[in-house]
């Protein structure tokens, strides 16, 4: 009974692979999808949402190899100012999984749902991860750290 919206930071026409398939599935099953291309889109969306209860951060993942660039850096700043719970999927966006240091900017989550196991850098990164919960995704035990 809770309304859900999925925000895409960028142009849906540029999506490829699983991201494109999942974006299309969301549309087919009736999930509200919004495209955020900049500050004006973000501010327009916020004005329409008087009470945001929860944000699920799944912007960037473990493949991030350099500093967070604009416009994602700006969006992370906006997320960090929202007065609601922020749950990061696997890793807060912008956080280095190995060191726990932000790569220019990082989401400050209240909770992180780590897939299979906590990342090596989580030990000193509670400011960004919040409470860490491990989700079993059937990762073979032999491959776990």
Question: What is each stretch, according to the model?
Answer:
Residues 1-55, 60, 65-70, 120:
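A cross-family phosphate/adenosyl-ligand binding-site feature
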Residues 51-145:
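YjeF_N-associated NAD(P)HX repair module
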């Amino acid at each position: 009974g809770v309304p859900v919206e999925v925000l895409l930071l960028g142009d849906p026409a540029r999506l490829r692979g699983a991201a494109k398939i999942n974006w299309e599935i969301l549309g087919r099953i009736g999930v509200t999808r919004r495209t955020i291309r900049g500050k004006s889109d973000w501010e327009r969306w916020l004005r329409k949402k008087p009470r945001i209860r929860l944000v699920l951060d799944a912007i960037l993942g473990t493949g991030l190899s350099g500093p967070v660039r604009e416009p994602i850096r700006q969006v992370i700043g906006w997320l960090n100012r929202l007065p609601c719970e922020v749950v990061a999927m696997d890793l807060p966006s912008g956080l280095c999984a190995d060191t726990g240091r932000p790569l220019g900017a990082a989401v400050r989550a209240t909770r992180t749902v780590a897939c299979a196991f906590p990342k090596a850098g989580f030990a000193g990164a509670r400011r960004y991860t919040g409470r860490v919960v491990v989700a079993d995704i059937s990762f073979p035990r032999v491959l776990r750290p």
